[in-house]
UniProtKB/Swiss-Prot annotation:
One of its GO terms (biological process) is protein secretion by the type IV secretion system. It is a multi-pass membrane protein. InterPro entries: Conjugal_tfr_TrbL, Conjugal_tfr_TrbL/VirB6. Residues 374-395 are annotated as: Disordered. Residues 383-395 have a biased composition (Pro residues). Its main location: membrane. The keyword Transmembrane applies. The keyword Cell membrane applies. This is Conjugal transfer protein TrbL. It comes from the Bacteria. Keywords: Cell membrane, Conjugation, Membrane, Plasmid, Transmembrane, Transmembrane helix.
Length: 395
């Protein structure tokens, strides 16, 4: 008996091949979209610069007048001499003049600080969200050379390469999204924070104006750290993809690239805010938070690995049964692939449905854990019994 492969499975593999071939130009255009978004934010922010600056100047001179008036009242109450009046006048003129200069040049100074730190992080080169996204596309394009499906090809390596490509593109897309968010914070924060410079007209509120300059330095540090992390991560991944071990140990290198891209994303998400909080004198996060989320990502990867192993075992069993029934080698291989991929997809879909409807025993496990249990049940292996439902002590 000859077992023919499923037409749906053949169509799926053909579709995947076309998507892999056509995805590079489309994804490359996404970098231009990020650049356009950044330029749009800059243009929109500049439209508010005059309005915010006029409001800050009005607030500054109102507070400066109040400051001079209070000083004059205290001098009159204390019956100060002419020398005291002259000394107080000089002191107030120097104070108001200094903060008036900061108000007039504060935005330019803040942008200069941020740009200088930004260039330090870029290492003298160019860095932008589009460049970060393009770096992920270059790594994925390099790995697409290993995604070759066929009867005489290493299909396990091809599946791992496709999986790693998806992980790399998603991770660098998220890093680019973080970059865009920080850039928006920089433009909007520095512009809206100009109103704080208007509070420098009084000695009682001058600390707010100083905090604006501290904020500018903290945003620059955040950008510098993010650019450094993105450039170092992309260089490491490109080096791994082009290293000699990429051809001798292809499977291990492919999985390592996928794992490192996730690590780069987690570091880019948590380390820059920590540096920003360090400059501002407040801790906004810790290393344990990054470790916790990294552990969650590792648990998800481990669950996906076990699910892949279970699907492979199911496919091998189906292929062996088909071969024993008289199927050809190609037919048995396709039947095994159909059983493995179809079983894994069905298990994940069933687990997602149980999590969505809140089935008994689904509340305490992850979706991948439930999918592994369902795949074991389909294969006839005993699975772990579901935990008991939570006890409601409230009557």
């Amino acid at each position: 008996m000859v077992v023919h492969p499923s037409p749906k499975l053949e169509l799926a593999f053909v579709t995947i091949g076309f998507v892999l071939l056509a995805s590079s130009p489309a994804l490359a255009q996404q970098g231009q979209v990020l650049t356009t978004l950044e330029n749009s934010v800059v243009t929109a922010a500049k439209g508010w610069e005059t309005t915010v600056m006029n409001a800050a100047r009005s607030l500054f001179w109102i507070l400066a007048g109040i400051e001079v008036g209070i000083a004059a009242v205290w001098l009159a109450i204390n019956a100060a001499s002419l020398d005291s009046w002259f000394a107080e006048l000089v002191k107030r003129i120097m104070f108001i003049g200094l903060f008036a200069f900061i108000l007039d040049r504060g935005l330019e100074f803040a942008k200069a600080v941020v740009d200088s730190l930004y260039q330090i992080g870029a290492g003298g080169g160019s860095a932008s969200p589009a460049n970060i996204f393009d770096a992920g596309i270059r790594v994925a394009t390099k790995m697409s050379e290993q995604a070759k499906f066929g009867l005489w090809e290493d299909n396990a390596l091809a599946i791992a390469a496709v999986f790693a490509m998806v992980v790399v593109v998603v991770s660098f897309s998220l890093v680019a999204a973080i970059f865009v968010a920080v850039m928006v914070e920089m433009y909007v924060g520095l512009l809206a924070g100009m109103i704080m410079l208007g509070l420098g007209g009084s000695s009682y509120t001058k600390d707010f104006a100083v905090k604006y300059l501290v904020y500018a330095f903290s945003v620059g540090m955040k950008l510098m750290a993010l650019v450094m992390i993105a450039r170092i991560g992309s260089d490491i991944l490109l080096g791994l993809a082009e290293a000699p071990t990429a051809t001798s140990e292809q499977f291990i290198t492919t999985l390592a690239i996928a794992g490192i891209s996730v690590v780069v994303f987690v570091i880019a998400m948590y380390v820059p805010p920590i540096l920003q909080g360090l400059v501002q004198g407040a801790s906004v996060g810790g290393g344990m938070e990054a470790i916790r989320h990294g552990g969650q990502a590792a648990s998800a990867a481990l669950g996906a690995g076990f699910l892949t192993i279970g699907a492979a075992n199911r496919g091998f069993a189906a292929a062996s049964a088909a071969r024993a029934g008289g199927a050809s080698l190609a037919g048995a291989a396709m039947r095994g692939l159909e059983a493995g991929v179809g079983g894994a997809a069905g298990a994940v879909g069933s687990a997602a449905k149980d999590k969505a409807i809140g089935s008994p025993g689904a509340y305490a496990g992850s979706m991948l854990g439930l999918a592994n249990a369902k795949l074991d049940q389909q294969s006839g292996r005993p699975g772990t019994p579901p935990p008991p439902p939570p006890i409601n002590d409230k009557k």
